[in-house]
Amino acid sequence: MTLAKPGSGAEFRLNNKANLKSRLVRDLSHAAGQEPEGSESLDPAMVAAVETLLRGIGEDPQREGLKKTPERVVAALKFLTSGYRQSLEDLINGAIFDEGHDEMVLLRDITLFSLCEHHLLPFIGKAHVAYIPRQKVVGLSKIARIVEMYSRRLQVQERLTRQIAEALMTMLDPYGVGVVIEATHMCMVMRGVQKPGSWTVTSSMVGVFQEDPRTREEFLSLIRHPSNL
């Protein structure tokens, strides 16, 4: 089999959780800190809606610290939902190769962040994606980009997991696909039950990953195995 680790390869230990949160903060800061490219690139109705929200919570959108906040929020949302403006075909761009390979290919520990569609709060975590090719393989970076494309939409974790698996099945027609996502949801940390440290695990097993217990167990064992790198 082929095992690829785009990041540290470590499992979810405390330091890894801190790294995930740091990554999210950097990405959100980058998005929110972007100055609008021009008023024509932002939807005035969205900008006005943010101003209305600010007034609704008792703030003054015209005070010094908030003058550009509506534009920044809209720019951030455009970045965080950029997956709506991407397609699977354009993303893959022909990077499928006939290698005659028929053993498991696994890309694990793919960092992801997304927005919960119920509260528009982030959830962050990692995806582990495996498939058994029917001779054809896809460039490894494309798997990470598929995760990113579907993550950058309003999501629930269950659907995100399924969409990643379905995309690989559609694109490669492999013998099977396995996807596991482990994530922490800010809607459970910052509000509601307020339970920091809780993690949600979802899976989507298709083809031999669903039908063959040995294939499924091999996949699950590999994503649990700590990296020695």
Curated annotation (Swiss-Prot):
Domain of life: Bacteria
GO-annotated molecular function: GTP binding; GTP cyclohydrolase I activity; zinc ion binding
Pathway given in the UniProt record: Cofactor biosynthesis; 7,8-dihydroneopterin triphosphate biosynthesis; 7,8-dihydroneopterin triphosphate from GTP: step 1/1
Biological processes annotated in GO: one-carbon metabolic process; tetrahydrobiopterin biosynthetic process; tetrahydrofolate biosynthetic process
Keyword Hydrolase attributed: yes
EC number of this enzyme: 3.5.4.16
Stored InterPro entries: GTP-CH-I_C/QueF, GTP-CH-I_N, GTP_CycHdrlase_I, GTP_CycHdrlase_I_CS, GTP_CycHdrlase_I_dom
GO CC field: cytoplasm
Positions bound to Zn(2+): 116, 119, 187
Catalytic activity: GTP + H2O = 7,8-dihydroneopterin 3'-triphosphate + formate + H(+)
Keywords: GTP-binding, Hydrolase, Metal-binding, Nucleotide-binding, One-carbon metabolism, Zinc
Quaternary state and interactors: Toroid-shaped homodecamer, composed of two pentamers of five dimers.
Family of the protein in this entry: Belongs to the GTP cyclohydrolase I family.
Record's protein name: GTP cyclohydrolase 1
Organism expressing this protein natively: Synechococcus sp. (strain JA-3-3Ab) (Cyanobacteria bacterium Yellowstone A-Prime)
